[in-house]
């Protein structure tokens, strides 16, 4: 049986600011619903991903700025250019034997690693 990750909660201080930031990065806003007083559910999906992030009011007790997420991209330099073109501060490409990485953070300090994998063992 396959197990597939669906949602990763991202703690934020300002839901509207965070939603606008992730849309600027290129995420699709799938849902934005106030379920009830104290619970707002905002689901955003990175381009080409089957896994989404969720942010909102009443979503997580984690402290904003403490989440770290790593995703795979086809080309680290192209991903970096996309971030810079969107006005997002991004690191230089970090070249490692197991892949190339680009790092950026959201307005609350949650950290993202974008990895272009050199190769995977067993395919």
Please provide the spans of the model-predicted regions:
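Short hydrophobic/aromatic beta-strand micro-patches
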Residues: 9-11, 70-74
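Core segments of cupin and vicinal oxygen chelate
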Residues: 2-3, 9-51, 85
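Short, basic, helix/turn surface patches
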Residues: 56-64, 116-123
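Vicinal oxygen chelate
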Residues: 1, 7, 32-33, 40-43, ...
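Short amphipathic alpha-helices within nucleic acid-binding modules
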Residues: 21, 77-82
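Short, charged/polar, Gly/Pro-enriched secondary-structure boundary elements
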Residues: 49-53, 109-112
């Amino acid at each position: 049986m396959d197990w597939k990750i669906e949602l990763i909660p991202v703690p934020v201080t300002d839901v509207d600011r965070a939603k606008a930031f992730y849309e600027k990065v290129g995420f699709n806003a799938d849902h934005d619903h106030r379920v009830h007083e104290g619970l707002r559910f905002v689901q955003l999906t990175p381009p080409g991903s089957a896994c989404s992030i969720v942010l909102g009011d009443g979503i997580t007790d984690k402290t904003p700025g403490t989440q770290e997420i790593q995703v795979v991209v086809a080309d680290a330099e192209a991903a970096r250019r996309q971030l810079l073109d969107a006005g997002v501060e991004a690191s230089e490409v970090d070249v490692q034997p197991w892949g190339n990485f680009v790092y950026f953070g959201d307005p609350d300090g949650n950290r993202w690693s974008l990895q272009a994998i050199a190769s995977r063992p067993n395919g």
